[in-house]
Regions:
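Canonical P-loop GTPase G-domain recognition
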Residues: 157-162, 169-197
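Ordered, soluble secondary-structure elements with a strong preference for glycine-centered loop motifs
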Residues: 10, 75, 110, 138-141, ...
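Structural beta-sheet core signal
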Residues: 131, 163-165
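Inter-motif core of Ras-like GTPase G domains
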Residues: 112-137, 149-156, 189
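Conserved nucleotide-binding/hydrolysis micro-motifs of P-loop NTPases
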Residues: 102-105, 135-139, 167-172, 190-194
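Conserved G1/Walker A P-loop phosphate-binding module
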Residues: 1-128
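Conserved P-loop NTPase nucleotide-binding/switch module
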Residues: 138-151, 177-180
């Protein structure tokens, strides 16, 4: 005979299974919507720039500074879960779209990459990768490696890369850095706007 604990366990399992099914349906819908949006952008020929970087590098702050987006800026893991895209006109008059992505972390488990795949895919389909690096972080080199390793796993390393060494206001001096994967390097501060011209 079954006791009340077993019935509760079965009910909890069913609720969890239903919730997982609902989330999978929602993820499929989000993926479908993003694919349609990407098709529309391609049709309109608006270049897309994916803002990528290690967690807390200042990606959302940079997006806000460049576009006035008002995206949540938090010093916490996975503060950005859903990519935000905003437009900006360049001095030449060309319109571009900037997309903020989830921050990368070291040893991100494969199942989490799968969970964030629809968010991280923005980098795969972008025309340019803007790699934001926290220049004040002592583990900057390791974090850069993690970002490139993740982009490689996403098959997104065939794009031009601009590396933006951010938070220069915290270190107060220019860096002598090398990024062999970058086509161009800039230094500045998303917080103060310095170096973003």
């Amino acid at each position: 005979t079954r006791g009340p604990g077993e019935k509760k366990l079965e009910m909890d399992r069913r609720l969890i299974k239903n919730r997982i099914a609902q989330l999978n349906r929602e993820l499929r819908e989000v993926k479908r919507h993003r694919e349609l949006t990407r098709e529309q952008r391609t049709k309109n020929r608006i270049p897309v720039v994916a803002i990528v970087g290690y967690t807390n590098a200042g990606k959302s702050t940079l997006l806000n500074t460049l576009t006035g987006a008002g995206v949540l800026q938090e010093d916490q893991l996975f503060a950005t879960l859903d990519p935000t895209t905003r437009s900006r006109k360049l001095p030449s008059g060309q319109e571009i779209l900037l997309t903020d992505t989830v921050g990368f972390i070291r040893k991100l488990p494969h199942h989490l990459i799968d969970a964030f795949k629809s968010t991280l895919e923005e980098a795969k389909y972008a025309d340019l990768i803007l790699h934001v690096v926290d220049a004040s972080n002592p583990q900057m080199d390791e974090q850069m490696y993690v970002v490139y390793e993740t982009l490689q796993r996403l098959e997104a390393m065939d794009k031009p890369v601009v590396t933006a060494f951010n938070k220069m206001d915290r270190i107060g001096e220019s860096l002598t850095v090398r990024d062999f994967k970058a086509d161009r390097i800039v230094q500045g501060s998303a917080k103060t706007g310095e170096g973003l011209e």
